[in-house]
From Swiss-Prot:
Positions of the catalytic residues: 43, 91
UniProt-listed CDD domains: S26_SPase_I
Domain of life according to the entry: Eukaryota
Full protein name: Mitochondrial inner membrane protease subunit 2
Localization per Swiss-Prot or TrEMBL: Mitochondrion inner membrane
Enzyme class: hydrolase
Entry's EC annotation: 3.4.21.-
Source organism of the structure: Bos taurus (Bovine)
Lineage, uppermost ranks: Eukaryota, Metazoa, Chordata, Craniata, Vertebrata
Amino acid sequence: MVQSQGWVRRYFKAFCKGFFVAVPVAVTFLDRVACVARVEGASMQPSLNPGGSQSSDVVLLNHWKVRNFEVQRGDIVSLVSPKNPEQKIIKRVIALEGDIVKTMGHKNRYVKVPRGHIWVEGDHHGHSFDSNSFGPVSLGLLHAHATHILWPPKRWQKLESVLPPERLLVQSEEDCL
């Protein structure tokens, strides 16, 4: 009986040591390096959730790349919603600071993206709440860079950083006139 209590005590002690090492490492990894997220909604179709409401893609979000604001045109990023800080949204980077972009929708105007900001849009233009609605987004709202689709298994793939052909940038301010 005494032997069995000693074994239980050693096991419990080893478990506690492992737990108190593993939890901080896991939390740090998920906060600083990468995490996974489920994508909901139709705003990024056909790139994400091509099946509509029947399926939700799960993506790998890499925190490392956005840590130094290393974003490129075409990247799919996760960011804090400028209209609801409790919500994270996923959009494609269309323009960087200093770029001139033509807005989509009823306004059809030109906007020069200010310093420290980016222009983001959903791939499904008619169903996306994006920079066409709320304007340029501060780089400080960036959360992560979506790099891969992890689920469902048939959609496993690397997400490419490509600009949609209809969203080519305005080359100069003269092109706006």
